[in-house]
């Protein structure tokens, strides 16, 4: 991809893609990483423009109106940390594996989502922005106050995931 992303990963991918295109005698076409995510729903559906998109990745959290190829309107975004970062940090605090998303999901299915009341930042604001830094801090505080038993991990994962859903979908 042409960006955005981690510079080392982009450099390796760019070098490989250029060499591969040359070896195959094909043109090299740079693609924006986020645009790839934004257009992926059209790969296996007859989705028409415009459509709403919730774009969540390791470094980005946005609501977009996809108007057409290359034309996007940002309706909301994170004002601090990306959701993927919050999932990875929570998984790390709970001593789960990486990437955090699948690990949190696995534990959350067996936990009590109502055990821990975590903050819902910006939920009453009249915009579509997110904030996940406070949620990460709240999880860290609760983890520091408890023994990290399997039950605790399941309940915290469920509470975290439930809270994230409340933030995104309210």
Predicted features and spans:
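Short beta-strand-loop/turn "lid" adjacent to the catalytic site in phosphate-handling enzymes
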Residues: 1-18, 22
């Amino acid at each position: 991809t042409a960006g955005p992303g981690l510079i080392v990963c982009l450099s390796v991918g760019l070098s490989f893609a250029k060499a591969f295109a040359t070896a195959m005698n094909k043109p090299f076409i740079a693609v924006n990483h986020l645009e790839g995510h934004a257009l992926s729903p059209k790969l296996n559906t007859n989705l028409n423009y415009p459509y709403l998109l919730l774009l969540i990745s390791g470094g980005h959290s946005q609501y977009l109106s996809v108007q057409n190829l290359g034309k996007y309107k940002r309706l909301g975004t994170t004002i601090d940390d990306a959701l993927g970062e919050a999932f990875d940090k929570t998984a790390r605090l709970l001593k789960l594996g990486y990437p955090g998303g699948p690990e949190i999901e696995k534990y959350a299915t067996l936990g009590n989502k109502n055990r821990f009341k975590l903050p819902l930042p910006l939920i009453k604001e009249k915009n579509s922005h997110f904030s996940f830094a406070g949620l990460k801090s709240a999880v860290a505080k609760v983890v520091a106050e408890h023994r990290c038993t399997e039950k605790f991990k399941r309940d915290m994962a469920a509470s975290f995931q439930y809270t994230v859903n409340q933030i995104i979908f309210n």
